[in-house]
Amino acid sequence: MSGTKYVDSEGFLYAAPVREQGNIYKPNNKMMADELSEKAVHDVDTKEIDLVNRDPKHLNDDVVKIDFEDVIAEPEGTHSFDGIWKASFTTFTVTKYWFYRLLSAIFGIPMALIWGIYFAILSFLHIWAVVPCIRSYLIEIQCISRVYSICIHTFCDPLFEAMGKVFSSIRATVRKEI
């Protein structure tokens, strides 16, 4: 049984002592349990969802946050009856609220399924196709880049160095005539 390696006070490495009882993942041995100081492991795929704050990253703050005042407004001097204004506010708000709930009840799960499949395919292609292709390309282009670099250093560097020396002796003077 291979265990964790420990270092004693003199710096010698030794294997962890074998326990008489207890699970290897959750030891009953108090000394080892204190040393391991177990931490809760969180799986990102099985995390709890927040039913209160359903947009923690604020994805839809500027897009779908539309209230009655954002759509319908009466300027000064053109007001309808107060009862009509209150009834239209209530109608707008309740209709928007319940129609959204109806649409999400009908199409929410199928759309979640479609988007889940889409992002799974996208992740799969990125992991198993795009990144390997890019890595392969970089490996293959490395050979070409070395040949290109040698050609540049062999032919272009001396040419441009010579041109620089030729043009470095040119002096320009600016004179202002009135």
Swiss-Prot record:
Topological type in the membrane: Peripheral membrane protein
Any Pfam family the entry gives: Caveolin
Positions of S-palmitoyl cysteine lipidation: C133, C143, C156
Keyword Hydrolase part of the UniProt annotation: no
Residue ranges within the lipid bilayer that do not cross it: 105-125
Cytoplasmic topological intervals: 1-104, 126-178
GO terms classed as biological process: caveola assembly; cell differentiation; negative regulation of endothelial cell proliferation; regulation of cytosolic calcium ion concentration; T cell costimulation
Keywords annotated in UniProt: Cell membrane, Golgi apparatus, Lipoprotein, Membrane, Palmitate, Phosphoprotein
Gene Ontology terms: cellular component: caveola; cytoplasmic vesicle; endosome; Golgi apparatus; Golgi membrane; perinuclear region of cytoplasm
Disulphide-bonded residues: none
GO molecular function: molecular adaptor activity; protein kinase binding; transmembrane transporter binding
Family annotation (InterPro entries): Caveolin, Caveolin_CS
Subunit structure and binding partners: Homooligomer.
Record family assignment: Belongs to the caveolin family.
Entry-linked PANTHER family: CAVEOLIN, CAVEOLIN-1
Function comment: May act as a positive regulator of T-cell coactivation. May act as a scaffolding protein within caveolar membranes. Interacts directly with G-protein alpha subunits and can functionally regulate their activity.
The protein's name: Caveolin-1
Encoding gene per record: CAV1
